[in-house]
A protein has these predicted regions:
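Short hydrophobic core segments
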Residues: 13, 133-146, 183-186, 328, ...
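Feature captures the FAD/FMN-dependent oxidoreductase FAD-binding
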Residues: 76-147, 322-323
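Alpha/beta-hydrolase fold catalytic core
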Residues: 275-330, 334-337
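Glycine/threonine-rich phosphate-binding loop and adjacent beta-strand/alpha-helix elements that clamp
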Residues: 44, 344-412
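Beta1-alpha1 glycine-rich phosphate/pyrophosphate-binding loop at the start
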Residues: 8-12, 17-101, 210-211, 274-279
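Short beta-strand to alpha-helix junction loop
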Residues: 72-90, 102, 186, 256-264, ...
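Rossmann-like dinucleotide-binding core of oxidoreductases
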Residues: 2-7, 11-13, 17, 22, ...
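C-terminal active-site-capping segments
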Residues: 399, 403-484
Length: 484
């Protein structure tokens, strides 16, 4: 979008799922406010525009991962990346959001002025290489939680000695020909289990090398109940029923994992044993932690297990001693020969797309701030952030956040306030890490993530029903949220 406008009521940063969802809530609930969306890339979609590796797909069902106001019409509920990208684009077009997006605009810094009660954004234009400035009363960060420029790769010994190709899935080489090649995928998360079946269709052998096992749940790629409802009900009604069905099921399953971890662990292992047998599962699918202590991976239609069963792929559970010319030497002295090594070793967590945050020309250390309802940060005025769930679809929480943000904006307008800022009670509320989650990328990031408190409204509960009443149906007024 080409515009000379340099001041807005609100600026949304990021044109992915959470950014488009925030824009919809904003223009529906606060129609008098003018806004723009700044997107650092040249296209809409966020994650789903960036990740293009073979087989990329959601690891959540699309009824909870997608927009509640835009029906998911595809019969596949565990959806392919290109279909998700088209869904985001179509939704943005349908609700006239696309025209509000300024592409190729990377926010370098955002500085709050207490005197002017406004944010000033310093923006890098990727096309002209020039620096632009925009002012706004409110800033809403929907830029995700990881570094788009590079993924995380551990410091593997002698990695440069390998004579073949090394690829991180975040930046896939589409010219890569892996036909009849030996491929080693390092990792056991969602990306690794997604890549394995699709690569095995052409490769000679695909080996998934994992340091330790992960919980994996087989799910049907199509939701039979949802597809039936689509045939007999209006699309939006069928979508809402299917969404609530899956929200409640996923929440019940998560709570069951927390309450009866041994029983649910046995249940998950037994489902895999039907395909791979006891010995294979006990060695490669027996995590040392409880179900949902880390994110549980979903695979559609048994594709991972069937590929292994058919001999086109294998799992090796060992640790790396060193890379060498032929591949990887394990600590057991076993050699894994490879033509291609894929480092599906995770993300680099990054807050606000690397943007510098300032208040009255002083840099704000985000790690010293506390998250208010997972929507705002303590002592940072007129600043909102989309923080999602780690135990469910990330975007479920982002949509509730957006609805609460619009409540705050309307409360400000009705009461003739211009500023809102959360103030943390250091004397009576204890500090905890923001995400009580043991995934590697979260543990690496704790040192620069904001904190949470040990009680409401400073505690992030990871519970949709609780957040529904707190955010969608809760009041904008709060003793810790100061309006001026």
């Amino acid at each position: 979008m080409k515009t000379k406008q340099s001041e807005f009521d609100i600026v949304i940063v990021g044109a992915g799922l959470s950014g488009i969802g925030a824009a919809y809530r904003l223009q529906n609930n606060c129609p008098t406010l003018n806004y723009t969306i700044l997107e650092g890339r040249s296209a809409i979609g966020g994650t789903w525009n960036l990740f293009t590796y073979p087989g990329v797909r959601s690891d959540s069902d699309m009824y909870t991962f997608g927009f509640p106001f835009s029906p998911w019409k595809n019969p596949k509920v565990i959806a392919d990346g290109p279909d998700i990208l088209n869904y985001i684009k179509d939704t943005a077009d349908k609700f006239d959001i696309t025209k509000k997006i300024q592409f190729d605009r990377r926010v370098i810094s955002s500085s709050w002025s207490s005197k002017n009660k406004k944010w000033t954004l310093k923006i890098g234009n990727n096309i002209t290489k020039s620096v632009e400035h925009i002012k706004c009363r409110f800033l809403y960060m929907c830029s995700g939680y990881y570094n788009y420029k590079e993924g995380y790769t551990p410091d593997f010994p002698n990695i440069d000695s390998f004579s073949g190709k090394i690829i991180h899935p975040q930046h896939w080489d589409h010219k890569l020909d892996y036909t009849n090649k030996k491929i080693v995928i390092i990792g056991s998360g969602a990306t690794a289990v997604t890549l394995l079946p699709i690569l095995a269709e052409k490769a000679k052998l695909v080996t998934m090398l994992q340091r330790s096992p992960t919980y994996i749940l087989n799910l049907p790629s199509e939701d039979v109940v949802a597809n039936f409802l689509k045939r007999i009900l209006p699309a939006i009604i069928a979508h809402r029923i299917s969404r609530w069905k899956n929200i409640l099921f996923n929440l019940a399953f998560y709570n069951a994992c927390q309450k009866w971890p041994k029983t649910l662990k046995k249940f998950l292992k037994n489902r895999i044993k039907k395909s791979l047998g006891n010995k294979y599962v006990d060695k490669h699918f027996d995590p040392k932690y409880g179900p949902w202590d880390q994110r549980l991976c979903a695979v559609p239609d048994n594709d991972l297990f069937e590929t292994i069963k058919n001999g086109k792929a294998e799992i090796v559970t060992e640790t790396i001693k060193t890379f060498n010319k032929k591949g990887i030497l394990l600590d057991s002295e076993k050699q894994l020969e490879a033509d291609i090594i894929i480092t599906a070793t995770g993300l680099k967590v990054q807050m606000f797309g690397g943007m510098e945050l300032l208040k009255d020309d002083k840099k704000i250390d985000v790690s010293n701030q506390h998250a208010f309802k997972g929507v705002m940060l303590s002592d940072v005025p007129n600043f909102f952030v989309a923080i999602g769930y780690t135990n469910a679809s990330w975007t479920l929480k982002c949509d509730l956040n957006a609805q609460y943000v619009t409540k705050i904006l309307n409360y400000l307008k009705i009461n003739n306030f211009t500023v809102c800022v959360p103030e943390f009670d250091h004397e009576n509320i204890k500090t905890e890490r923001l995400l009580n989650f043991d995934a590697g990328y979260i543990l690496r990031a704790n040192k620069f993530l904001p904190k949470q408190g040990d009680k409401s409204p400073w505690k992030v509960y990871q519970n949709y029903i609780r957040d529904l009443f707190s955010l969608k149906y809760g009041k904008a007024s709060n003793e810790y949220l100061k309006y001026k």
